[in-house]
Amino acid sequence: MKTHFNFDTVVIGSGPGGEGAAMGLAKKGQSVAVVERYKNVGGGCTHSGTIPSKALRHVISRIIEFNQNPLYSEHLQSIHPSFYHILQHANHVIRKQVSMRFDFYQRNHCHLFFGHARFIDPYKLEVIRPDGTLNTLSADHIVIATGSRPYHPESIDFTHPRIYDSDSILELKEEQQPKHIIIYGAGVIGCEYASIFRGLGVKVDLINTRNHLLAFLDQEISDALSYHFWNNGVVIRHNEEFDLIEGLDQGVVVHLKSGKKVKADCLFYANGRTGNTKELLLENIGLRTDERRFLQVSNLYQTALSHIYAVGDVIGYPSLASAAYDQGRIASQAITQGINSVRLIENIPTGIYTIPEISSVGKTEQELTDLKVPYEVGRAQFKHLARAQIAGMEAGSLKILFHRESKEILGIHCFGERAAEIIHIGQAIMEQKNGGNTIDYFVNTTFNYPTMAEAYRVAALNGLNRLF
């Protein structure tokens, strides 16, 4: 027996993209249904991605800070908790996030359906509930916000108890904590978990399929991360690809195409993502995906079927929770108001939660050089800031790229603790209109003292002193 419901819009997925769309639609008076395949709202971001990994990272960075501070180490024993115990903190944060986000949907009168959604026709979905019951949902518009999952090459046995991806690593038991781990893939996820495991004292082999880390970053920032990893004992192997991954009873051996072999207690595969679209039965409505199952969309996030939108990780780049929410918001405006002029901001900040953090907004030196833009560089080393000295967070720097003639800020790159927060000061000034986005602002404004924000004044003065 099927129960049928009609709505103005159905949103598939309750992560940042789905939430942004649902909230925007509901606030415009639409009747909205949200379908979530997991038992709680929040999506992969809350349950297996951003929230748990950043909660892990925060605890471990504080433990490192405690253990390295001579004031504490002289009088107290160092702290060495397990990955499993720190996960309990992450789970506590997840529960808070779920409760808060569930309340958002309730307050905005969104109808929640927990189960797997699949298309019957372009305007109708079937939802299979956990107890096996079926609901059909009809709507004038549908928003696909199903996110992504770790990419699994067919040649790797992910059922092996010592081979993990970014979802299964969060199920690591206390007795399974490795002393040595191989991380295959040195993208954002791979680098973040390399920091996490090395911070726990685990030996880390980081296998990178490219010639340097995080190639989309400014070269200096990438080099700073590489040096920091090297200085902390992470072994990085660039330009390597696996030929065979061999799961053993007591470990994993990675056979590389270069002829090398690497052995460790376990393998964490972090090389790519794939869109969560297979179960939607898109073939029933003639909607196609690319080879990684990502959907193609217009600048308003419309798919090839104009009444069906897609937002968030299911469309691939930039695969940021922050961007996903805004994509959902923009899609909701297109649906309710027909607005076609709203766009994501041009300069989306990126935050990478390694230890220390990395954050960037705007152009890199390499991009400006290729564009033949006459730019100059201003730098501030954190070790010269009073606040960094007080906090014992002296590793890192801030780098401002600006036009030599107009002094317009072109890019900001930060490596160090709190980088993802610090970057937003520069981002706010970059977005100013009518000539307000110049490096002179940082020289002429007054900063609290002592603060990490002072790095902007130091970097601005450093850059202006280079002009002639």
Swiss-Prot record:
Annotated localization: Cytoplasm
Keyword list, A-Z: Cytoplasm, FAD, Flavoprotein, NAD, NADP, Oxidoreductase
Enzymatic reactions: NAD(+) + NADPH = NADH + NADP(+)
InterPro entries attached to this UniProt entry: Class-I_Pyr_Nuc-Dis_Oxidored, FAD/NAD-bd_sf, FAD/NAD-binding_dom, FAD/NAD-linked_Rdtase_dimer_sf, Pyr_nuc-diS_OxRdtase, Pyr_nucl-diS_OxRdtase_dimer, STH_gammaproteobact
GO MF annotations, alphabetized: dihydrolipoyl dehydrogenase (NADH) activity; flavin adenine dinucleotide binding; NAD(P)+ transhydrogenase (Si-specific) activity
GO CC, one annotated term: cytosol
Coiled coil location: none
Residues the entry annotates as binding FAD: E36, R37, Y38, K39, N40, V41, G42, G43, G44, C45
CC cofactor: FAD
SUPFAM superfamilies tied to this protein: FAD/NAD(P)-binding domain (SSF51905), FAD/NAD-linked reductases, dimerisation (C-terminal) domain (SSF55424)
Top-level lineage group: Bacteria
Database matches in Pfam families: Pyr_redox_2, Pyr_redox_dim
E.C. numbers: 1.6.1.1
GO BP, sorted A to Z: 2-oxoglutarate metabolic process; NADP metabolic process
Cofactor binding: number and manner: Binds 1 FAD per subunit.
Family: Belongs to the class-I pyridine nucleotide-disulfide oxidoreductase family.
Task performed by this protein: Conversion of NADPH, generated by peripheral catabolic pathways, to NADH, which can enter the respiratory chain for energy generation.
The protein's name in its UniProt record: Soluble pyridine nucleotide transhydrogenase
